[in-house]
């Protein structure tokens, strides 16, 4: 295995991908790429511009003239820039969460962002998380992980995340939103949410995130010794 392999982490909303990917990138000294944040940035722009989320040609035109960049600040936290503006906090709003799957299902939007994502990973040493990293974006990634958890557990985690940002959402409502998002993500024509054939599937409903990270680090270490 390459000493600086690319690691693909996929899974549904709330499965813990971002937390695992962030910790893993720090542990290994790799670049962390949150592809979901990139789609959220495009969704935010669509909302701001008043683009109908059912208007796929309109969303395609929007994506074509949109710049999304990811940078790490002095504390090692990922910052998301939309056309030069830091939108790291705003893209996590409930409105964007509802819109992002509708934006991400547009083929031209995915093509635009996948191009950017592949360029970021061209040198290796990347931890990239999203919905179709191991199947579409980086099908040749040396390590592929698919994280999953029950809808109830994912809803609980998402509610806690939103509460920390000042948003209060009912648990039942959140479960319904998670379930609907799963439906959209798994049935879309472009890059549907499915595990890669060679991915390791990890159910982290009750598994501490530290244990998940330790398992993946062990895989990287074992590969380097081969």
UniProtKB/Swiss-Prot annotation:
| Top-level taxon | Bacteria
Where does this protein hold ATP?
A: 11-19
Catalysis: reaction(s): CMP + ATP = CDP + ADP; dCMP + ATP = dCDP + ADP
Q: Name one GO molecular function term.
A: CMP kinase activity
Q: What class of enzyme is it?
A: transferase
Q: Which InterPro entries match?
A: Cytidylate_kin (IPR003136), Cytidylate_kinase_dom (IPR011994), P-loop_NTPase (IPR027417)
The biological process GO terms on file are: nucleobase-containing small molecule interconversion; pyrimidine nucleotide metabolic process
Q: What Pfam families does this protein map onto?
A: Cytidylate_kin
Primary residence: cytoplasm
Q: Does the keyword Cytoplasm apply?
A: yes
What are the entry keywords? ATP-binding, Cytoplasm, Kinase, Nucleotide-binding, Transferase
Q: Using the chain's own numbering, where are the disulfide bonds?
A: none
**Which cell locations does it reside in?**
Cytoplasm
Report if keyword Kinase is assigned.
Answer: yes
Q: Which GO terms describe its cellular component?
A: cytosol
Q: What is its EC number?
A: 2.7.4.25
Q: Say which family it is in.
A: Belongs to the cytidylate kinase family. Type 1 subfamily.
Protein's recorded name: Cytidylate kinase
């Amino acid at each position: 295995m390459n000493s600086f392999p690319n690691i693909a982490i996929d899974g549904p909303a709330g499965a813990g991908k971002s937390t695992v990917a962030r910790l893993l990138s720090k542990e290994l000294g790799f670049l962390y790429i949150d592809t979901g944040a990139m789609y959220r940035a495009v969704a935010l722009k669509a909302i701001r511009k008043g683009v109908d989320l059912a208007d796929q040609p309109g969303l395609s035109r929007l994506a074509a003239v949109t710049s999304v960049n990811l940078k790490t600040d002095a504390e090692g936290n990922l910052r998301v820039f939309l056309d030069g503006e830091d939108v790291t906090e705003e893209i996590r709003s409930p409105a964007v969460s509802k819109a992002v799957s509708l934006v991400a299902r547009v083929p031209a939007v995915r093509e635009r962002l996948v191009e950017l994502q592949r360029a970021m990973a061209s040198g290796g040493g990347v931890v990239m998380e999203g919905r179709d990293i191991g199947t579409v974006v980086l099908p040749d990634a040396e390590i592929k992980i698919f994280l999953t958890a029950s809808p109830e557990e994912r809803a609980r985690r998402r509610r806690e995340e939103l509460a920390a940002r000042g948003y209060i959402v009912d648990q039942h409502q959140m479960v319904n939103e998670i379930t609907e998002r799963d439906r959209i993500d798994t049935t879309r024509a472009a890059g549907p949410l499915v595990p890669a054939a060679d991915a390791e599937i990890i159910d982290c409903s009750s598994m501490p995130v530290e244990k998940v990270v330790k398992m993946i680090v062990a895989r990287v270490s074992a590969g380097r010794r081969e």
